[in-house]
């Protein structure tokens, strides 16, 4: 049958570039087809034409009947089947080898570029990226174990070669059925020219040949089943990868873009950052001012959250306008109130002074001369004495206490209390001196 070593060496290369099911298919091809076909089938079909005997003496009738019974030898048919079924695998191996060589050239080119970069940097070590490190590892592993992944055009070529193998298997099984059927009969009747009549021909080893035919057909069906299984395996794998990509790609993007997003977000916050509604700060609302808040109850009685806002909850830019205004201090408010209250007090004091002057003139006894006293000074008579002084001092105290009570802020209740302390000696002496000056 010839030497199968050449085809075997090529198919070994296919084993290195196939899936698990593809390797099983190659095992079936080598052991159950090539090995059995090269060892046992030749001995069974070795005497095929010589042992084909017909009951006629007509020259050429036996050869014509054999050609009609066996248009092609089973062994040659199976050899053609092996060749045709292996051809797509050979095409795939050629493409895989080309792909591997191109990858090796690309990796060598990248390694040269890295060397040139390191030389251009003055001998400094350039930090190796993870992709480049993986490329180096994969290149070393590909040289050692020749492992790779089915992706891209290589995967398409692999799927196409499985489809063609399946088609060839089905075609040869159907052709075998139409040519021979699934069994060999011991008696074959032939009526072909130049036979004078119907001739009976006898086949040697019909049972053994039938067993071999059934065995080879079963191996063909097993190979067909493995092809279908491999197609379904690749299909399920593609579906799983398609379902996993939407879940895995966002994670990969987040992992790659996390550092970039952090840097960009920090720059944007530095330029301008607006607080969200839930991030509003309310600790700067003061209950004593009437700009932003109005106190509904004492500060110690209720928490700060119970203050009601006068201004609607709008953007913080509107709220900040109220706090930019300058608020009047306690001193300014007190000064304004004093200015308002001084005018009616002065008007009330002037008529009181005039009445006191008239009373002093009436009370003065006859024979004494009245002296004109300038405004603002007290007039005392010798007849009145110390009682009038006490009454005037008490009136002055009352007026002073009223003014102080009106001018003092409401927040200090201690200042509004009456002062019942006695007058000092100096104040009494000054009042006596004034009364002595007024008397004549």
From Swiss-Prot:
A biological-process GO annotation: camera-type eye development
Membrane-topology descriptor: Multi-pass membrane protein
Compositionally biased spans, kind Basic and acidic residues: 353-364, 375-399
Extracellular topological intervals: 43-71, 183-210
GO CC term (a single one): connexin complex
Alphabetical UniProt keywords: Cell junction, Cell membrane, Disease variant, Disulfide bond, Gap junction, Membrane, Transmembrane, Transmembrane helix
GO molecular function: gap junction channel activity; identical protein binding
InterPro entries, per the entry: Connexin (IPR000500), Connexin50 (IPR002266), Connexin_CCC (IPR019570), Connexin_CS (IPR017990), Connexin_N (IPR013092), Connexin_N_sf (IPR038359)
Side of membrane Cytoplasmic, spans: 13-21, 93-161, 232-440
TM region(s), chain numbering: 22-42, 72-92, 162-182, 211-231
Region (Disordered): 111-143, 334-440
Disease the record associates with this protein: Defects in Gja8 are the cause of cataract.
The family this protein is said to belong to: Belongs to the connexin family. Alpha-type (group II) subfamily.
Function recorded in the entry: Structural component of eye lens gap junctions. Gap junctions are dodecameric channels that connect the cytoplasm of adjoining cells. They are formed by the docking of two hexameric hemichannels, one from each cell membrane. Small molecules and ions diffuse from one cell to a neighboring cell via the central pore.
Quaternary structure, from the entry: A hemichannel or connexon is composed of a hexamer of connexins. A functional gap junction is formed by the apposition of two hemichannels. Forms heteromeric channels with GJA3.
Protein name: Gap junction alpha-8 protein
Organism: Rattus norvegicus
């Amino acid at each position: 049958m010839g030497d199968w070593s050449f085809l075997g060496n090529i198919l070994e290369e296919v084993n290195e570039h196939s899936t698990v099911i593809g390797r099983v298919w190659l095992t079936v091809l080598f052991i159950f087809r090539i090995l059995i076909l090269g060892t046992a089938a030749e001995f069974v079909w070795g005497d095929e034409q010589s042992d084909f005997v017909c009951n006629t003496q007509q020259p050429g009738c036996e050869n014509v009947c054999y050609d009609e019974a066996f248009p092609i030898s089973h062994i040659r048919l199976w050899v053609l089947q092996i060749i045709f079924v292996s051809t797509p695998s050979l095409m795939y191996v050629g493409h895989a080898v080309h792909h591997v060589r191109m990858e090796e050239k690309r990796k060598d080119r990248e390694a040269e570029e890295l060397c040139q970069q390191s030389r251009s940097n003055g001998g400094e070590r350039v930090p190796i990226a993870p992709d480049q490190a993986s490329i180096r590892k994969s290149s070393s592993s590909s040289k050692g174990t020749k492992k790779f992944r089915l992706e891209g055009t290589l995967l398409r070529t692999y799927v196409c070669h499985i489809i063609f193998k399946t088609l060839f298997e089905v075609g040869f099984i159907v052709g075998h059925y139409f040519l021979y059927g699934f069994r060999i009969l011991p008696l074959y009747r032939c009526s072909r020219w130049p036979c004078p009549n119907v001739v009976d021909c006898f086949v040697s080893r019909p049972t053994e040949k039938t067993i071999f035919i059934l065995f080879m057909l079963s191996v063909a069906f097993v190979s067909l089943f493995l092809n279908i299984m491999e197609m379904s395996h690749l299909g399920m794998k593609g579906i799983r990868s398609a379902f996993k990509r939407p879940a895995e790609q966002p994670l990969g993007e987040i992992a790659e873009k996390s550092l970039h997003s952090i840097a960009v977000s920090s720059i944007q916050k530095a330029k301008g950052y607006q607080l969200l509604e839930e991030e509003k700060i309310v600790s700067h609302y003061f209950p004593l001012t009437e700009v932003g808040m109005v106190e509904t109850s004492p500060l110690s009685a209720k928490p700060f959250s119970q203050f009601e806002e006068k201004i609607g909850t709008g953007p913080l830019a509107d709220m900040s306008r109220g706090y930019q205004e300058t608020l009047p201090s306690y001193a300014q408010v007190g000064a304004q109130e004093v200015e308002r209250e001084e005018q009616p007090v002065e008007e009330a004091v002037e008529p009181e002074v005039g009445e006191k002057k008239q009373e002093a003139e009436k009370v003065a006894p006859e024979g004494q001369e009245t002296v004109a006293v300038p405004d603002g000074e007290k007039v005392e008579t010798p007849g009145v004495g110390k009682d009038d002084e006490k009454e005037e001092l008490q009136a002055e105290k009352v007026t002073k206490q009223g003014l102080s009570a009106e001018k003092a802020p409401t927040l200090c209740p201690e200042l509004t209390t009456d002062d019942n302390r006695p007058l000092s000696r100096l104040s009494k002496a000054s009042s006596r001196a004034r009364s002595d000056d007024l008397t004549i």
